[in-house]
Amino acid sequence: MTDVSAAASRPAVPPSVIDPDAPAKVAARNLNFYYGQHQALKNINLSIAANRVTAFIGPSGCGKSTLLRVFNRMYDLYPGQRVEGQVLLDNTDILDPRLDLNLLRARVGMVFQKPTPFPMTIYENIAFGIRLYEKLSKSEMDDRVEKALQGGALWNEVKDKLNASGLSLSGGQQQRLCIARTVALRPEVILFDEPCSALDPISTAKIEGLIDELKEHYTIAIVTHNMQQAARVSDTTAFMYLGEMVEFGPTNKVFTSPADRRTQDYITGRFG
């Protein structure tokens, strides 16, 4: 299926999800971000509705992964970076320096490009994060681990080997373990940064199917270089170029009748 036909087959998304004044789960307002003197994000404004999948597309270096990292303040881990504007999570500005970052990152989970299982058992990969926030009995923890692995579409494959190392799993299974680890903390938003770029087509299809299931319970933002993937999994799509938000709207509209020539040129492969 082509990018355009995949996008066209998706149900239309109400225009309200891109109304900057509409209620949003996550919203950026006049957002600017700097790596030292380099401005990586330029006056970003967008609203992401709850229980939708929003894809961020654009050429390498356009700022899409940077934007994702601003959503849970990963940039705080590195010196010399600066942010201006607002990022709202349920109308609370997460850029407030008084905010508890551990609690923020529990609410806004992240799955990275390369699977990053901990060097411990499958069970402990899930339980470790839960223990940082909650004190559960053994039976309660067992239940949470099972539910998390079910949420990551992995339970049936690992239920008989929970004491095996997470590193013993295949690449696709490791990525689903990372998703389960994120789900275990009961976040409200899940950020995916190129989650399938290191996976084979079969594993990619499983992750995409899982994302479609997860949006029933979570708000999802995904960065991808794969146009077909963006068209398949997302409800709304944002095209970014040179740190700017060029276009943001329902995926079927962005792919079939983009409003900006740069969007059309990128989607049709004229650059990028």
Swiss-Prot record:
Sequence positions that bind ATP: 58-65
This protein's GO CC annotations: plasma membrane
Membrane topology per record: Peripheral membrane protein
CDD domains, alphabetized: ABC_PstB_phosphate_transporter
UniProt xrefs under InterPro entries: AAA+_ATPase (IPR003593), ABC_transporter-like_ATP-bd (IPR003439), ABC_transporter-like_CS (IPR017871), P-loop_NTPase (IPR027417), PstB-like (IPR005670)
SMART domains documented for this protein: AAA
Single GO molecular function: ATPase-coupled phosphate ion transmembrane transporter activity
Keyword annotations of the record: ATP-binding, Cell inner membrane, Cell membrane, Membrane, Nucleotide-binding, Phosphate transport, Translocase, Transport
Broad EC category: translocase
Family membership noted in the UniProt record: Belongs to the ABC transporter superfamily. Phosphate importer (TC 3.A.1.7) family.
Summary of subunit composition and partner proteins: The complex is composed of two ATP-binding proteins (PstB), two transmembrane proteins (PstC and PstA) and a solute-binding protein (PstS).
Protein name, per record: Phosphate import ATP-binding protein PstB
Organism of origin: Nitrobacter hamburgensis (strain DSM 10229 / NCIMB 13809 / X14)
Highest classification ranks of the organism: Bacteria, Pseudomonadati, Pseudomonadota, Alphaproteobacteria, Hyphomicrobiales
